[in-house]
């Protein structure tokens, strides 16, 4: 087992565009060890991080936090319409199909499936800074 924070920092670095157009913040209140299928957890983490990268404008910030057994990925992108929040985890669903972001609408659905398989809960909400996705693993 490797600490979740270390794994997340590696995955975040891999998900970021090479041009340095995005800022990141990372914080963890502990070194959490998560008992999970490594490959599946990596895929779920990649989906959350790639989603944040896709929906963060140039100069924006992606914030990853681990606290109290919950991992959250927030970004400074546009708020998600309230009616769309419950459906974000559905396969092929896109809150705003007219947006010019790439993606097929499967990433968050895959992440939710992985979280469900491990007995984790997950959710999405809007904050003052932008959208935040989270999953509770402890």
Language-model segments: residues:
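Conserved glycine-rich
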Residues: 119-120
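Short alpha-helical Gxxx[C/S/T] motif in the catalytic ATP-binding
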Residues: 107, 111
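Short helix-loop "hinge" at the ATP-lid/N-box region of the Bergerat-fold HATPase_c
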Residues: 52-53
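Short conserved segment of the HATPase_c
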Residues: 80-94
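Conserved micro-motifs of the catalytic ATP-binding
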Residues: 33-36
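Short conserved segments within the C-terminal catalytic ATPase subdomain
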Residues: 15-25
């Amino acid at each position: 087992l490797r600490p979740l924070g270390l794994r997340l920092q590696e995955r975040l670095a891999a998900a970021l565009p090479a041009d340095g157009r995005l800022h990141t913040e990372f914080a963890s209140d502990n070194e959490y060890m998560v008992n999970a299928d490594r490959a599946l957890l990596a895929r779920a983490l990649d989906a959350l991080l790639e989603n944040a990268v896709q929906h963060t404008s140039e100069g924006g910030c992606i914030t990853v936090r681990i606290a109290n057994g919950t991992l959250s990925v927030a970004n400074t992108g546009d708020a998600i319409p309230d009616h769309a929040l419950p459906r974000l985890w559905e396969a092929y669903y896109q809150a705003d199909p007219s947006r010019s972001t790439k993606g097929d609408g499967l990433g968050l659905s895959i992440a939710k499936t992985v979280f469900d398989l491990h007995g984790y809960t997950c959710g999405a909400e809007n904050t003052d800074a932008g959208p935040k996705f989270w999953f509770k693993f402890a």
